[in-house]
């Protein structure tokens, strides 16, 4: 792909200008799977740029959209969080080489995107585990939580980052990375060590480093209150923090871990407070809250953000019982040597060049994880198993033979600790082991590492009963809940500044940016079995241990021009406006579209399965409708496509207002019924006055969106819904009555007398004030008072869609991931600190 480097010179402005836009057109005309991956990585750092690009050109770039979803955003492999993290790290390694091949595809300077970072300077408690689930990597701050430790990725500042990827040694310009490690066990340190440059790795053998990173901070009262009740011998807890002997033990353990190549490291002495075992069920432990102050601000200065670990502990305890019997997942490389300080990127090159590497493998439920040793590179292959969990209860001898499984809190009291000697083996599930605490051996760049990890949900990967190769020595293992309360766990870990290694792209920080607010047209899954085919949708479309909801893994195929060959719909030519979908944690306003013609062309197998035994989370097709006030958010003219109007919608969420951006398609396809809400802006400015809001209701399938406006007061509606959780069902009932009573008049010729407004009077971005009284507009609100605060505009549906409230055809050509994007962005813009409470959800759902 040839590019003109003249587009990317030092004369660039700090914002997206027309030169870059022309370059994007060049990229668009030469799209290929490799270049789309590169564009995807670019979007992880500059999401607004890619959103702008896709808004203009996405109609004929389905390969890009498909690649974004398949490669990294919505299909992390099953398993614990660090398994997914390794997946993304491998992806970033692959992307780094593409940077080297196409250096001038990226501008040398781009300003920071305040839109994605402005709300995070506020002090608010963030639960690390919840943060990871809600918006992984979307915020310049990625918090990865395991059962026993938290690792914080914090770019040093949010100042504009200069990009010049003309060669691999320029990757260091990405910026400095600050690791804040909370030493709950040794795993956080191992993790940082694996991804640290050589000069930082040497610190492991520096006594001054240990003096700094292990410092007693907890008070006597705090420690005495935090001693768990289930610990066998609480006297081993030191009162005044870790002793010198503890520090030496930790140093000895870590150093031997990073230098040993056999399983003898399991016998290494560990800090006494880290070797406690449970004599009761782990869920009986006292849950303590350990708050960690992390420093991050927009301008790079420091401000306090309290991260509460209590919820993470509760999540662990809440799922230990139900995850009994799940197994460890082992990633082992043939190269069993410890990470070397001078590791090169040789294996990473193999990872990029090898077709059947991490990125082409997606874990599906009920599949065997087979690790081959044909190459130094760990290669994952998936084979469908019988789909049932092993019923035979593992005895102690079987459990002791299990490879790479810590089984913290297992019933026999002792758990094996070892590292696989051979990389081709099938891991055996063990009864009585909590999946949250499995050790996973990760294949780094020519190295191997084991971690204590946790998964939010119990993994559903069942494996055949087969003998494991290694027979590790049983040894006491870390206890996540116990170490959570030990004195050393509450110590301030200190800051370890890690600089990116010039020649090792694996040192890039995981910046997993979700691409938000994209207008995507993707087909919904067809009938099929997720257990028989590897589906990139399976992570989100299958739920629970024995999900019976059936989905196909068949993916849409595209011709070179980019039009969809597999989809029977016409959506690739005329994309629908995607609606933020109603999820269990939010109720949103949405732009809705139904295509009657496309609905008629759908095959029966492609219609959503309404009667599935288990309705997958985030894939419901029911749309609840709420009116909200809307405000125009003006952006520079060169960043907004002319056929889109960017808005920020304010919605009711647990008594608070939250914002999310969405796009309105200005001109709908003929035959498409659109219900859209636009904004009347009496004045210009960054935020126009929300005093008046106008709502569009089209009168015929080919009517313009601006044909009908109804003026009303939105604030009363918000207040009513916020204070009365039972309002909405009655609103829907009234709406149904109004729909039936006005069905004839909606389609009658008299409808043509509705006052219409010429399109010429409308700005492509901001509507001028245009108001009509409800009585003039339509008989739609005939049974409603014009000033009623509970008035709900009716939506026109294709007949037969479940009394008009089912909008199946909207999502017949849509996949749920985009809908979740709106949700993630919504959570991100509101700090992600509050989930929807059942109090207001019950009345609305």
UniProtKB/Swiss-Prot annotation:
Residues 563-576 have a biased composition (Low complexity). The modification Phosphoserine is found at residue 567. The keyword Phosphoprotein applies. It is found in: Mitochondrion. One of its GO terms (cellular component) is mitochondrion. Keywords: Mitochondrion, Phosphoprotein. Residues 390-399, 534-546, 579-588, 600-614 have a biased composition (Basic and acidic residues). Residues 224-244, 324-346, 383-434, 456-485, 519-619, 674-701, 739-785 are annotated as: Disordered. Residues 224-241, 400-422, 674-683, 691-701, 743-760 have a biased composition (Polar residues). The keyword Phosphoprotein applies. This is Uncharacterized protein C428.10.
């Amino acid at each position: 792909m040839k590019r003109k480097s003249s587009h990317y010179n030092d004369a660039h402005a700090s914002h997206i200008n027309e030169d870059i836009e022309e370059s994007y057109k060049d990229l668009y005309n030469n799209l290929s799977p490799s270049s789309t991956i590169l564009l995807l990585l670019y979007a992880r750092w500059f999401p607004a740029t890619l959103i702008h690009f896709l808004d203009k050109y996405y109609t004929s770039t389905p390969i890009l959209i498909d690649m974004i979803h398949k490669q990294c955003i919505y299909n992390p492999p099953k398993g614990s969080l660090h398994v997914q993290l390794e997946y993304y790290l491998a992806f970033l390694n692959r992307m780094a080489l593409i940077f080297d091949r196409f250096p001038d595809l990226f501008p040398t300077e781009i300003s920071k995107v305040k839109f994605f970072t402005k709300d995070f300077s506020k002090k608010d408690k963030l639960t690390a585990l919840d943060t990871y689930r809600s918006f992984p990597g979307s915020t310049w701050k990625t918090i990865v939580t395991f059962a026993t430790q938290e690792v914080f990725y914090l770019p040093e500042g949010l100042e504009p980052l200069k990009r010049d990827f003309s060669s691999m040694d320029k990757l260091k310009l990405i910026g400095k990375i600050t690791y804040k490690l909370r030493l709950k066990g040794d795993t956080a340190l191992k993790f940082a060590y694996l991804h640290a440059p050589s000069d930082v790795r040497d610190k492991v053998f520096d006594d001054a480093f240990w003096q700094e990173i292990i410092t007693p901070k907890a008070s006597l009262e705090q420690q005495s209150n935090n001693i768990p009740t289930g610990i066998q011998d609480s006297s081993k807890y030191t009162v005044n923090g870790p002793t010198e002997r503890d520090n030496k033990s930790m140093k000895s353990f870590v150093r031997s871990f990073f230098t040993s190549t056999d399983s003898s490291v399991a016998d290494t002495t560990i800090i006494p407070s880290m070797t406690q075992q449970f004599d009761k069920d782990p869920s009986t432990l006292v849950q303590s809250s350990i708050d960690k102050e992390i420093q991050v601000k927009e301008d790079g200065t420091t401000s306090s953000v309290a991260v509460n670990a209590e919820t993470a502990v509760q999540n662990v305890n809440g799922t230990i019982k139900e995850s009994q019997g799940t197994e460890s997942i082992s990633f082992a490389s043939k190269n069993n040597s410890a990470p070397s300080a001078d590791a090169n990127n040789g294996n990473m090159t193999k990872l990029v060049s090898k077709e059947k590497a991490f990125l082409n493998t997606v874990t599906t439920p009920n599949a065997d994880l087979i690790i081959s040793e044909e190459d130094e590179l760990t290669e994952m292959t998936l084979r469908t198993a019988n789909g049932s969990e092993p019923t035979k209860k593992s005895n102690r001898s079987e459990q002791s033979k299990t490879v790479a499984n810590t089984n913290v809190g297992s019933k026999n009291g002792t758990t094996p600790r070892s590292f696989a000697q051979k990389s081709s083996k099938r891991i055996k599930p063990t009864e009585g082991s909590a999946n949250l605490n499995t050790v996973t051996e990760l294949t780094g760049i020519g190295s191997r590492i084991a971690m204590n990890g946790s998964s939010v949900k119990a993994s559903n990967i069942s494996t055949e009963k087969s003998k494991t190769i290694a027979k590790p020595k049983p040894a006491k293992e870390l206890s996540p809940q116990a170490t959570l309360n030990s004195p050393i766990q509450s110590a301030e870990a200190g800051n370890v500044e890690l600089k990116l290694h010039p020649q090792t792209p694996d040192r890039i920080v995981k910046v997993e940016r979700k691409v938000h607010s994209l207008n995507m047209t993707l087909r919904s899954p067809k009938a099929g079995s997720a257990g028989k085919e590897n589906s990139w949708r399976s992570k989100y479309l299958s739920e629970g241990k024995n999900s019976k909801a059936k989905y196909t893994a068949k993916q849409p195929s595209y011709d070179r021009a980019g039009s969809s060959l597999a989809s029977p719909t016409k959506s690739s030519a005329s994309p629908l406006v995607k609606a933020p979908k109603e999820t269990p944690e939010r109720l949103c306003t949405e732009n809705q579209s139904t295509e009657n013609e496309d609905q008629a062309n759908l095959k029966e197998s492609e219609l959503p399965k309404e009667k599935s035994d288990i309705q997958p989370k985030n894939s419901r097709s029911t749309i609840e409708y709420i009116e909200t006030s809307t405000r125009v958010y003006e952006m520079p003219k060169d960043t907004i496509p002319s056929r889109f109007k960017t808005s920020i919608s304010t919605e009711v969420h647990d008594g608070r207002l939250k914002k999310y951006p969405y796009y309105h398609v200005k001109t709908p396809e003929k035959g498409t019924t659109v219900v859209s809400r636009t904004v009347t802006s009496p004045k210009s400015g960054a935020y126009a006055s929300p005093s008046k809001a106008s709502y569009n209701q089209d009168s015929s399938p080919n009517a313009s969106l601006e044909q009908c406006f109804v003026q009303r007061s939105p604030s009363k509606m918000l207040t009513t819904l916020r204070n009365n959780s039972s309002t909405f069902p009655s609103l829907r009932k009234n709406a149904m009555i109004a729909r039936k009573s006005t069905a004839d008049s909606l389609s009658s010729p008299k409808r043509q007398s509705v006052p219409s407004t010429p399109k010429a009077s409308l700005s492509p971005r901001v509507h001028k004030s245009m108001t009509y009284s409800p009585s003039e507009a339509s008989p739609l609100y005939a049974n409603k008072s014009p000033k009623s605060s509970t008035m709900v505009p009716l939506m026109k549906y294709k007949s037969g869609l479940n009394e008009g409230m089912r909008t199946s055809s909207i999502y017949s050509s849509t996949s749920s991931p985009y809908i979740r994007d709106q949700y993630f962005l919504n959570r991100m813009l509101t700090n992600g600190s509050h989930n929807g409470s059942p109090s207001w959800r019950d009345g609305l759902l």
